[in-house]
């Protein structure tokens, strides 16, 4: 979600003539879009901005700012220890950033002009003091009606294949460990027509895969829009977006288990453009801890939900989030989580050590867990998850899978990177003509969290039009992938 917010800010600045630069030392505006889910993210952002203090002394005309969740949570206090910070903008004001930047730049130019008319003596001291004698700053963390509809513009790169679409803002769940309801506000949803229009525009510009974003995406519209034919607003949205001509894949993240009703499971089974991947946060396998977290489901209900999702779609990948070391988590509680992870065999999981967030109920709980215990549980669970991930990848070796090529690999630019419908990363030989296209890839080996393969050559070329599933098709006895016989799903 932060990535999508950053795209919106970048688009608004570029629309006014600004350009991206690769080095902070070349910038006229430096903005850090922040996350507050874990304390480490806060500390990283504060440390980064602190390091930029030297640049601020060298280039006093530059605008420095904090955006996003940490800005929302801390507001004006961020100015106290970081005198070079000019701008603090919360989560409902991203669309105001360009205006604020222009206002600050104008004030700085005026200040520079006045300062230049002063005595030319002691220039270095004046540079170091920067604007201490007349400081300009803007802090805006107020709520704004309709802010959910302001994240709607995107600056696409050439041959960009994927895009995020924000469908809602805020969260009403109030999990005891989470600061998001404080930083993102209450649930607010965009209209189906508005979202579908944005998707149509993106697809017309070459995008083939859309990911719908929301804090709890499957609770979209529950306060604004009615059910129709027993279908929730979220399922109605999925069906509307699914109808967009030219769209090849549709994803959504992140859902909450309590929002997975039968209508959504049915949609997974009958909407072929929906990717064969569900990210379903678990958080804990202990009912005691789930209750303390205010998660509103039990481990048993979670397992049953996973089974129903898997029955609805062959080869669907399930990934999850897990927190270890939540206050009061005993060894037995942790063992219950470990046992459940082993039972479900997730395709992948993000495992986090519990991080207290200020002003959350969990942070005030007295039975906090020692850091060394959190770390031991984190490492133990990661080993288990990594083994499950490895097996999931190895099952695809020798198979032919459809991959959406996103571009050069970040770790090896000589190769291209794409994703299967099941969200597996696949690396293959670079051919720039494949960027932004669906390609049939024969998987040759699994390498940790990624797969390696070779594009399949056929009489029609190497682009995919079979609509195969992410679980692949077998290689024929003659050594050629049996790619002509897909699973019958539309691309």
Regions found by a protein language model. Name each.
Residues 1-221, 233, 263, 268, ...:
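Proteins enriched for Cys/Gly/acidic motifs involved in redox and nucleic-acid/cofactor modification
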Residues 110-137, 227, 457-487:
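Intrinsically disordered, low-complexity terminal tails and inter-domain linkers enriched
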Residues 157-161, 171-173, 274, 284, ...:
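Short flexible coil/turn linkers enriched for glycine and charged/polar residues
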Residues 174, 178-185, 249-258, 284-295, ...:
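Conserved strand-turn element in the central/C-terminal portion of the radical SAM core barrel
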Residues 175, 195, 212, 252, ...:
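Conserved, mostly hydrophobic/aromatic
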Residues 235, 243-244, 249, 261-320:
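Radical SAM/AdoMet-radical enzyme domain recognition
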Residues 329, 343-346:
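Contiguous mid-protein beta-loop-alpha structural module that forms a pocket-lining wall or clamp
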Residues 364-473, 478-491:
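Terminal RNA-binding accessory module
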